[in-house]
């Protein structure tokens, strides 16, 4: 300003000085009903504290000094004149903030923080969980896992409730209340076969490939289960494993069943089995030879080797259907295998073929259906037949004289 030669180190001080030349007073009194305005905040604070209240919030921070002032300008003047410019330059003379709404809240917070410091409790929000974890962690290791859960329920509210709650409980009480249960003793490997049928079905559904690995998985699981029983000193033969269905108990019967199914699906007439024989030499076969060869043939079927060509001089051509074939008769009785496996095994040697006639011509009929008659086919084709009759279940050839 023209005619003024004052200099200031801070821009704010220069602006405040310029207001004295311009007459600008942007700081008005905040007290209700008071309309006084001031050019700087220091003068306004001095007015409010002196006129509208008797507080002196600005305290000298010098050691041993108890002076209090209503405005910061009076405090600065006191520090410069009494304690020296060096003490003022270190900014150790700053007092408390103004006596407004924000300053009151800040003073309340500082007072509550001071009370917490007297109890050796850190009131910062970041250290609430860690401090509770430290207190709980000194009781026992099992409480450490519960400290994170309990800290969320005991958060500090202005630093008062948390201190009261922690002082009412001792570490021993926390250890008794927050003691964890003992861990369950679980087996490392749980076999699917050991589970009940309902749970095992659910496991198979969830796996997605239960149909492909049901038989192999059940066998392996059953072997592991029996080996574990033997290591524990338990006789597995005396234990009834009724809940574990054995889908492959008799391997020979299953393989024989599979072999018969393959023979049925071969490119023959609807599953009929043919053994090539010569019609010229079939008449010359003796009943004893045919009896021996047929016995060998039936034993071969039961020994899981399939049905092969009869050795020896039997080369006549005949056909076996579901009524005169041991293998086909067994296949017909295989339908009752699901209900009883023991009756399936016992029914093999007691079955006897029923006399019927076979033809050399191919006919499309169901070999399993017992109601099919071969006599109509015999009459239509007009071919000679050989009757196989036996009381012991073995066929004997009778020569047809009409041939």
Swiss-Prot record:
<comment type="function">
    <text>Involved in segment polarity. Required for the normal development of the posterior half of each embryonic segment. Engrailed protein directly represses ci expression in posterior compartment cells.</text>
</comment>
<dbReference type="GO" id="GO:0000981">
    <property type="term" value="F:DNA-binding transcription factor activity, RNA polymerase II-specific"/>
</dbReference>
<feature type="zinc finger region" description="C2H2-type 2">
    <location>
        <begin position="27"/>
        <end position="52"/>
    </location>
</feature>
<feature type="compositionally biased region" description="Polar residues">
    <location>
        <begin position="323"/>
        <end position="332"/>
    </location>
</feature>
<keyword id="KW-0863">Zinc-finger</keyword>
<keyword id="KW-0677">Repeat</keyword>
<keyword id="KW-0238">DNA-binding</keyword>
<feature type="zinc finger region" description="C2H2-type 3">
    <location>
        <begin position="58"/>
        <end position="83"/>
    </location>
</feature>
<feature type="compositionally biased region" description="Low complexity">
    <location>
        <begin position="139"/>
        <end position="152"/>
    </location>
</feature>
<protein>
    <recommendedName>
        <fullName>Protein cubitus interruptus</fullName>
    </recommendedName>
</protein>
<comment type="similarity">
    <text>Belongs to the GLI C2H2-type zinc-finger protein family.</text>
</comment>
<feature type="region of interest" description="Disordered">
    <location>
        <begin position="110"/>
        <end position="152"/>
    </location>
</feature>
<keyword id="KW-0217">Developmental protein</keyword>
<feature type="region of interest" description="Disordered">
    <location>
        <begin position="313"/>
        <end position="352"/>
    </location>
</feature>
<dbReference type="Pfam" id="PF00096">
    <property type="entry name" value="zf-C2H2"/>
</dbReference>
<keyword id="KW-0709">Segmentation polarity protein</keyword>
<dbReference type="InterPro" id="IPR013087">
    <property type="entry name" value="Znf_C2H2_type"/>
</dbReference>
<keyword id="KW-0479">Metal-binding</keyword>
<feature type="compositionally biased region" description="Low complexity">
    <location>
        <begin position="333"/>
        <end position="347"/>
    </location>
</feature>
<dbReference type="InterPro" id="IPR043359">
    <property type="entry name" value="GLI-like"/>
</dbReference>
<dbReference type="InterPro" id="IPR036236">
    <property type="entry name" value="Znf_C2H2_sf"/>
</dbReference>
<keyword id="KW-0862">Zinc</keyword>
<keyword id="KW-0539">Nucleus</keyword>
<dbReference type="GO" id="GO:0000978">
    <property type="term" value="F:RNA polymerase II cis-regulatory region sequence-specific DNA binding"/>
</dbReference>
<dbReference type="GO" id="GO:0008270">
    <property type="term" value="F:zinc ion binding"/>
</dbReference>
<feature type="zinc finger region" description="C2H2-type 1">
    <location>
        <begin position="1"/>
        <end position="21"/>
    </location>
</feature>
<feature type="compositionally biased region" description="Basic and acidic residues">
    <location>
        <begin position="110"/>
        <end position="121"/>
    </location>
</feature>
<dbReference type="GO" id="GO:0005634">
    <property type="term" value="C:nucleus"/>
</dbReference>
<dbReference type="GO" id="GO:0007367">
    <property type="term" value="P:segment polarity determination"/>
</dbReference>
